[in-house]
Swiss-Prot record:
Catalytic site: K75 (charge relay system), S150 (charge relay system), S174 (acyl-ester intermediate)
Organism: Burkholderia pseudomallei (strain K96243)
HAMAP family: GatA
EC top class named in words: ligase
Keyword ATP-binding found: yes
Catalytic activity entry: L-glutamyl-tRNA(Gln) + L-glutamine + ATP + H2O = L-glutaminyl-tRNA(Gln) + L-glutamate + ADP + phosphate + H(+)
InterPro entries, per database record: Amidase, Amidase_CS, Amidase_dom, AS_sf, GatA
Function according to Swiss-Prot or TrEMBL: Allows the formation of correctly charged Gln-tRNA(Gln) through the transamidation of misacylated Glu-tRNA(Gln) in organisms which lack glutaminyl-tRNA synthetase. The reaction takes place in the presence of glutamine and ATP through an activated gamma-phospho-Glu-tRNA(Gln).
Protein name: Glutamyl-tRNA(Gln) amidotransferase subunit A
Oligomer status and interactors: Heterotrimer of A, B and C subunits.
PANTHER family: GLUTAMYL-TRNA(GLN) AMIDOTRANSFERASE SUBUNIT A (PTHR11895:SF151), TRANSAMIDASE (PTHR11895)
Record's keyword terms, sorted: ATP-binding, Ligase, Nucleotide-binding, Protein biosynthesis
UniProt-listed SUPFAM superfamilies: Amidase signature (AS) enzymes (SSF75304)
Amino acid sequence: MHAKSLTELRAALDAKECSAVELAQHYLKRIDAARDLNAFVHVDAELTLAQAKAADAALANGEAGPLAGLPIAHKDVFVTRGWRSTAGSKMLANYASPFDATVVARLSAAGMVTLGKTNMDEFAMGSSNENSAFGPVKNPWDTSAVPGGSSGGSSAAVAARLAPAATGTDTGGSIRQPASFAGVTGIKPTYGRVSRYGMIAFASSLDQGGPMARSAADCALLLNAMAGFDERDSTSLERADEDYTRHLGKAWAAGGDAGKPLAGLRIGLPAEYFGAGLADDVRAAIDAALKTYEALGATLVPVSLPKTELSIPVYYVIAPAEASSNLSRFDGVRYGHRAAEYRDLLDMYKKSRAEGFGPEVKRRILVGTYVLSHGYYDAYYLQAQKIRRIIAQDFQEAFKSCDVIMGPASPTVAWDIGAKGDDPVQMYLADIYTLSVSLAGLPGMSVPCGFGAGANAKRPVGLQIIGNYFDEARMLQVADAFQRATDWHVQEPAGV
């Protein structure tokens, strides 16, 4: 059952081969058996089965939503009524939200059944899921490796078939990089496409929710339910609802040859994504994927994104600045961790935050406070925002000669747990290919396309596909065509 796609699972429900309750029980047993992966931080079987029973009733009455009865796991950055909402932090270890995030509410309205909350880097700050107050997540493909971050619990859950789908968030690569490391498909939509209401904030001008699943087709189904305008989110974009499945299985150009479904597609290859720092085994997997695209009829076009190397310093000025502001609300007064002993109000603030936040979060708060301080704002934050606009302009220049841009999602495969913990800068460098996409607000996704070599032969590689604003449906079409021609996305870790 757990090897089936969302479409196949829904067909099984409609054919009464199984019930939503039986499906939920199946996944709950798998989650319990795989506790060593540490992919989930909160599971409540009673709540899950109650939702499944409601889905069965809706299916029986013919009132079911398009995703009715299908299980999903939610990254613990989305607040959920009934389940704890911790953002991977001691600060919120016992926080119970009185409402559902819009993403959670929309998926529930479509009939999906919540399996639980997945582990994550604290407040979404990290690239390895080692920064969680609840311990690191293990990569199902190689349990000595990280699953990526910050949506590492979600990527591990989907890869290990503990859930057929999961929600994630992406601020600088936190859907795409863990999708790459865990061999699953994940998409970060255009900024503003998916509501941030009820998403615990890290960097408000960058945060964006999106789906993670086995395939592009599954992600398209999920995005149909997740995306859309939300008046409760000031950054939500007012656009007509779309069917993100509408191009799947179709030729890129009208009247196209079935043997060359992507004839006419121009794929831009940035020179900056294939230079020094890209591991040989990752390069080999990406090159092989690009050859598949050529066989499907696509044309490869050289493009340039000259400010790529500046995306790391720009991001690590802007994101910490916004984080320092967003996280100032956690003071031990209204909600969150409060120190047990303190002398006065100021001491309570200090001790509550010192005890509640982990080291990486503290590091970014300090950096953010510094770059926003008097005398440094113009030199750092203002300059970073100017370069951010140039990065966005570079992408628009590139899109004049191509339809999508491709390259690696990460310069390496997943590294060993603990390998980069003492050097945060090395961790930051791993996001070199994803940060600029986030800074520009563009949609990007990662698709499994192979594995590393030698000692890394069990560690997946992801191909990043970048589209222009609001081109998600076309990106999903491009990814789906690749997945129809290959089987990387259906391969499973040993023992699954």
